[in-house]
Regions:
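Sec-dependent signal peptide recognition
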Residues: 2-10
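Hydrophobic alpha-helical targeting segments used for export or membrane insertion
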Residues: 9-13, 414
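C-terminal motif of bacterial Sec signal peptides marking the signal peptidase cleavage site
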Residues: 15-18
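Feature marking well-ordered beta-strand scaffolds used for ligand recognition
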Residues: 20-414
C-alpha cells in the first residue's frame, strides 16, 4: 500500500530527433523504467516466519505501541518486536518476516498488518511469539513495492491478467527502453503515438504516519483513494463494504472523537464516523502539493507539510487548524519548518520530527514558536508516539526514547 507515481519520462532520458519528408517530426526516446519482479502466490503466502533472532532496526517504518511492546515495520520486510517495559533499556525481542509489510494496527491481542495484496493477522497474547492466524487474500489489489530509484513503472506489466497470473510483485528491476514518437504538424507537437510509461477493548497506539486505524470494532485501511472497512468483532476480520472511494489519495489516518482526519498530498480531509460502515465526508483544508500527517487534540489539528518526498514540492510547514466546527475548519496559523515529518501530542505538549525532535507547549497556538521547550538534533526523526510520559521516536538510524515527565528538565534518550 504505497504511493506510486507515473511519469512519461524518467530521470534517464535521451532524445534523438529527425524529420521525414512529409513533415512528420520523429523522436527516438530512451528512458529508464522499473519492470516488476514476481514471486509465486504459494511461495509468497508461505513465507511468513517468526524468529527470536535480533534483527537490527536499519530502516524507519510505521510504529504501534501495545501493552509495553513496540512494533516497528521494516518496510517490505517485516515487523520488529521491541520489549519496552523498561524504556531506558529497550530490548529487541523478535522479528516477524512478512514480505510487503508497511502498516499495522493492534486490538485485543490481535496484530493486523498488510503483506502487499493481503491483510494478515497474528495472535500476540504472547508478544514475543506471535502466531499467524490467517489472511484476507487480495484485500489490497493495487499494492506494489516501494520505488526508491525515482523511475516510473510499467503499469501493464503489474496489473494485466497475464501479470496477475505470475503471482505477486515483490521488487523492481530497472530497464532502459527505446521508443519512437511521431509528431504530426496538423495535430500539434504534443501528440504522442505511444505512452512511454503510463502507467472495551485494548487497542494499540499508532504513530501519525499510519494508514491503518481502528475505531470501535472496525479496522479502516486506505490504499491511495480507496478505503476498506473490516469488522474485527468475530474470529477473523471481515470486509464489510465495497470499496469506499475518497476524494483524494490518502496517506495518513487519525481518529479524534467520532471523526477521522486524513492527510493527503493536497490537504486534510475530515470524515464523520457516526455510521462506522459509511464514513461521510464533512470538509477539507487544502494546501500546496505536499505530504502530510495530522494529529488532533482539544479541537486543534496539527498538520505538517514537507519537501524532499515523492510529492514533489519545496514547502515545509506546520499548520494549526481549528476543527471545533468540523464543517468549517479554520486555518489559524502556519509556521515555517526545515523538513517536518511525523508528530504527536499529549496533554498540550507537541512533539515534532523536524531537524531531529522539537517539543512545544501549545497553550497559545499563535505564539507556538516562542514556546519551544527543547530541540534535540543529530538524528532524522520520522514518527513519534507519546504515551504516559515516554516519547518513542523512530528515526533513520533506529529507535529513540525520551522521558517527558519533567518538561523543564532534560529528556533522556533510551
Amino acid at each position: 500500500m504505497r504511493k506510486l507515481f507515473y511519469w512519461a519520462f524518467a530521470f534517464s532520458l535521451c532524445v534523438l530527433m529527425g524529420c521525414k519528408d512529409d513533415g512528420v517530426r520523429v523522436e527516438v526516446v530512451r528512458y529508464a523504467i522499473n519492470e516488476p519482479v514476481f514471486m509465486s502466490i504459494s511461495e509468497f503466502r508461505n513465507s511468513v516466519k517468526v524468529t527470536d533472532e535480533v534483527v537490527p532496526i536499519t530502516k524507519r517504518g510505521k510504529i504501534c505501541f501495545y501493552k509495553d511492546y513496540l512494533y516497528i515495520s521494516s518496510p517490505d520486510k517485516g515487523i520488529h518486536i521491541v520489549d519496552n517495559r523498561n524504556p531506558a533499556s529497550p530490548r529487541i525481542a523478535g522479528f516477524v518476516e512478512l514480505i510487503g509489510n508497511e502498516d499495522l494496527s493492534i486490538k485485543d491481542d490481535k496484530l493486523y498488518a498488510d503483506s502487499y495484496v493481503d491483510l494478515v493477522w497474528f495472535d500476540i497474547s504472547d508478544p514475543e511469539r506471535p502466531e499467524l492466524e490467517g489472511r484476507v487474500e487480495n484485500a489490497f489489489r493495487y499494492a506494489l513495492p516501494t520505488i526508491e530509484n525515482g523511475y516510473g513503472f510499467d503499469y501493464n506489466m503489474c496489473y494485466s491478467e497475464e501479470a496477475r497470473a505470475k503471482g505477486v510483485v515483490v521488487g523492481w528491476e530497472p530497464k532502459e527502453r527505446e521508443e519512437t514518437i511521431y509528431h504530426y504538424p496538423s495535430y500539434g507537437d504534443d501528440l504522442m503515438a505511444n505512452d512511454a510509461a503510463s502507467g472495551t477493548s485494548t487497542q494499540g497506539v499508532n504513530g501519525s504516519m499510519a494508514r491503518f486505524s481502528i475505531y470501535g470494532k472496525y479496522l479502516y485501511t486506505v490504499e491511495q483513494n480507496i478505503m476498506c472497512v473490516f469488522d474485527l468483532s468475530g474470529d477473523k476480520p471481515v470486509l464489510t463494504t465495497n470499496d469506499i472511494w475518497l476524494q483524494r489519495g490518502v496517506e495518513t489516518l487519525f481518529n479524534y472523537k467520532d471523526k477521522m482526519f486524513m492527510g493527503t498530498p493536497t490537504g486534510m480531509l475530515i470524515y464523520s464516523l457516526e455510521d462506522p460502515l459509511a464514513p461521510k465526508y464533512r470538509s477539507s483544508v487544502s494546501h500546496v502539493f505536499g505530504c502530510d500527517p495530522v494529529v488532533v487534540e482539544d479541537d486543534l489539528a496539527y498538520v505538517t507539510v514537507h519537501s524532499g518526498n515523492t510529492c514533489g514540492q519545496n514547502t515545509n510547514e506546520l499548520m494549526l487548524i481549528d476543527v471545533s466546527d468540523v464543517d468549517q475548519p479554520n486555518l489559524l496559523v502556519t509556521y515555517g519548518m526545515k523538513c517536518p515529518k511525523g508528530l504527536g501530542i499529549d496533554n498540550g505538549t507537541l512533539f515534532l520530527c523536524d531537524e531531529g525532535l522539537k517539543v512545544f507547549n501549545t497553550k497559545d497556538p499563535m505564539t507556538l514558536m516562542a514556546n519551544q521547550l527543547v530541540h534535540y538534533a543529530g538524528m532524522e526523526g520520522y514518527d513519534v508516539i507519546p504515551f504516559k510520559n515516554t516519547l518513542m521516536m523512530i528515526a533513520d538510524d533506529g529507535l529513540y526514547q525520551y522521558d517527558y515527565s519533567n518538561l523543564q528538565g532534560c529528556f533522556t534518550r533510551a
